């Protein structure tokens, strides 16, 4: 299995396709298998598509430390350096959007373009007050079991998918649910990743981003994040990040890249208009 030695851990990664490099940063506790559902096949036709397991997930090392956005970003920088990539398109979904934002701030020379998809607001709401962050996941795991808890993030229409797509494409829903569960680790590792959400101020850090940026979100992504929603965060990010673009994809909820191909086409359009030098 391909892995990069980064500091005191190993990060599992895969590369698919040729062309300008695109780094895909996953949400908290999502193994890289999930990108194989639609996203890698779409992007790898034109781009060198790089996916990886964050520390604590999949095949990567599972230390008991380093679960914060800055460290996740440092791990990504280490992976790019290991692959001898001097600049890449950096794309992140949900918590992954915070990770690539942190990379763009700490090491802007490595980031040709930045795409923040369906990111949370971080430690503050869109109005700037501290976000309510009560971890109820342990209660849900105890009530329903770990597998049902994990798959439940995908197998629904109230948060994940628009009902029409969900009913017409059950194979996509099942494939994504299977990929999310396939290499899950443990409730303890899940807890580490949940706590990482409390370590980054997405909106507060937004003005520090100086690279071409696409803010991407489903127009129907109203999942409650303790006083904020991804679509509300997206609109605010577009106001705060200089010269950024906002793309709200119609008829799409939180599964941005999987609830139809609208977000993938928006991403491809942005990347084509911003080739790496």
Predicted regions, residues:
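Conserved HGGG/HGGXW glycine-rich cap/lid loop of the alpha/beta-hydrolase fold
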Residues: 7-59
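Active-site loop/oxyanion-hole signature of alpha/beta-hydrolase fold enzymes
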Residues: 50-91
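Flexible "cap/lid" loop of the alpha/beta hydrolase fold
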Residues: 101, 105, 112-146
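Short beta-strand/loop motif that positions the catalytic acidic residue
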Residues: 209, 215-217
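Acidic catalytic loop of the alpha/beta-hydrolase fold
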Residues: 220-229
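Catalytic histidine-centered segment of alpha/beta-hydrolase-like enzymes
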Residues: 249-264
